[in-house]
């Protein structure tokens, strides 16, 4: 876009002269600086009662085939679940009495997909049938942790505002809480608490 964008990226990532970024390193780039196309999720399965809370505050009964846009929230009732499909092949099952907001879902100019959801309460399972493409990202937040798919399947439970539980079923999942990041392999889990 413009030459000052680099200064913004350097400031956000706390880079100092000579501004070296190493191979396999990660940097944060504000979405406002990226060329992108906004995408939506597909509702694959609805069992029981589920509601789609739109960004304008209006709610609607969730049905199979509906599309979910960034800013919208899926809420499941008692004994209900919803299964969603992301464009990159990730399936998300939202368990009973849960709420997941799609923070963003976009395709960059190079076709890479970036997605993030916020699980404010309840439990979900993310399942990936095949490895994500290089530089695709799929993150799910709770009030306490951020998880990123590095493998194939994991569960995430938001235990209120102060704790979260992550269980890796297959593959590897990256979990960040505060300034600490750990990688959980299959059959590993953790419970993170605020503070």
PLM ranges: what are they?
Residues 3-38:
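Extracellular LysM carbohydrate-binding repeats and other cell-envelope/extracellular binding modules
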Residues 23-26, 32-195:
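Flexible, surface-exposed loop/linker segments and immediately adjacent secondary-structure boundaries
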